[in-house]
């Protein structure tokens, strides 16, 4: 007997769950946001994002497949004519889920799921980590000395491992212990 792979059903059965997800995604496409429970928002996200990806392909076949899932011509028109061109440059991640508190009646955690219609920011990788000026870091350039590492300074007073006393019973405050 087949079992649900994504945990327990949101509603009474698989057919009813598909209808609820279709109605919720139609409301999401028409209103651009939807306030629902956290569990329903998490189940709606992949369902709606697959429909947005389908609408980005365009074409009659994609439109008919989306209509067979959505069953709402107004939402289908909104999805294909208004939403798809806005998310054309975005590769996934078309929705955002924001937790908004708890429902007053039964204390269920509520969430706001909304479409991300802003254009993708044109960031270049690594520009925020590079310094403004680049210095010569070739093999001939020596690294800057670390402060306190000069001979005679406090950090340079430790004896080398070769010059440490050979007798283990002899203790010194500057003795380096090798383990």
Swiss-Prot record:
Task: Could you list this entry's UniProt keywords, alphabetically sorted.
Answer: Ribonucleoprotein, Ribosomal protein
> Where are stretches of biased composition, namely Low complexity?
154-168
User: What InterPro entries does the record tag this protein with?
Assistant: Ribosomal_bL17 (IPR000456), Ribosomal_bL17_CS (IPR047859), Ribosomal_bL17_sf (IPR036373)
Segments carrying the region annotation (Disordered) are 123-179
Cite the PROSITE patterns for this sequence.
Answer: RIBOSOMAL_L17 (PS01167)
This entry carries the following GO cellular component terms, namely: cytosolic large ribosomal subunit
Compositionally skewed regions (Polar residues) per UniProt: 170-179
Q: Which GO molecular function annotations are given, in alphabetical order?
A: structural constituent of ribosome
One matching Pfam family is Ribosomal_L17
Q: Please name the PANTHER family in this protein's record.
A: LARGE RIBOSOMAL SUBUNIT PROTEIN BL17M, RIBOSOMAL PROTEIN L17
Instruction: State the family it belongs to.
Output: Belongs to the bacterial ribosomal protein bL17 family.
Protein name according to UniProt: Large ribosomal subunit protein bL17
Species of origin: Tropheryma whipplei (strain Twist)
Tell me the lineage of the source organism: Bacteria, Bacillati, Actinomycetota, Actinomycetes, Micrococcales
């Amino acid at each position: 007997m087949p079992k649900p792979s994504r945990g327990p059903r949101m509603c009474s059965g698989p057919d009813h769950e598909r209808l609820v997800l279709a109605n919720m995604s139609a409301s999401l496409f028409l209103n651009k946001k939807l306030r629902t429970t956290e569990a329903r928002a998490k189940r709606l996200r992949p369902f709606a994002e697959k429909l947005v990806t389908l609408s980005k392909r365009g074409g009659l076949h994609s439109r008919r497949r989306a209509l067979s899932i959505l069953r709402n011509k107004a939402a289908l028109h909104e999805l294909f004519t208004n939403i798809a061109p806005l998310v054309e440059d975005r590769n996934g991640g078309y929705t955002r889920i924001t937790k908004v508190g708890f429902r007053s009646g039964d204390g269920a955690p509520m969430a706001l799921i909304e479409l991300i219609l802003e254009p993708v920011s044109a960031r270049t990788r690594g520009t925020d980590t590079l310094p403004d000026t680049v210095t010569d870091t070739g093999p001939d350039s020596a690294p800057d000395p670390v402060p306190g590492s000069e001979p005679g300074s406090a950090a340079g007073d430790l004896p080398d491992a070769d010059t440490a006393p050979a007798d283990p019973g002899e203790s010194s405050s500057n003795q380096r212990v090798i383990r």
